[in-house]
Regions:
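Conserved active-site alpha-helix within GNAT-family acetyltransferase domains
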Residues: 72-96
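Conserved beta-hairpin
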Residues: 8-22
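Conserved acetyl-CoA-binding loop-helix of GNAT-fold acetyltransferases
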Residues: 46-60
Length: 98
C-alpha cells in the first residue's frame, strides 16, 4: 500500500510505503482524471519498476478513471510497456527568454 503525503510544494506528494520513502510525484487533477507532470523515485530504487507502481496506485483510487504522465522522450517505451499509450498529437514546446 502506497501513501501519498502532501509536501510544502503545491500538488506535490511524497510517496512512501509508510516506512520507506519511494520518491515524489506532482500531479494535477480534473474531474476523474490525473495528469502527472513530475515523477521522481529515490536513486537506489531505479530499475525496480517503482514509477509504474506509483502511477497504478493513483489509478486504483475508485474516483479516478484515467491517468496521464508527462514523460521525457527517453522513457516513452518504459511507460508504453506499463500500459500507457503515446499520443503523438501533443508535444510540449518550451520558449526561454532571450
Amino acid at each position: 500500500r502506497m501513501v501519498f503525503e502532501p509536501t510544502s510544494q503545491d500538488q506535490t506528494f511524497t510517496v512512501s510505503t509508510g516506512a520507506q520513502r519511494l520518491g515524489y510525484v506532482t500531479y494535477h487533477r480534473k474531474d476523474r482524471s490525473i495528469v502527472a507532470t513530475n515523477l521522481q523515485i529515490e536513486p537506489y530504487l531505479e530499475g525496480l519498476d517503482i514509477e509504474s507502481q506509483i502511477l497504478d496506485a493513483l489509478l486504483s483510487h475508485e474516483d479516478v478513471e484515467q491517468i496521464q504522465i508527462l514523460s521525457p522522450i527517453n522513457l516513452i517505451s518504459y511507460y508504453e510497456e506499463a500500459g500507457f499509450e503515446c499520443q503523438t498529437k501533443h508535444i510540449l514546446l518550451t520558449k526561454k527568454k532571450s
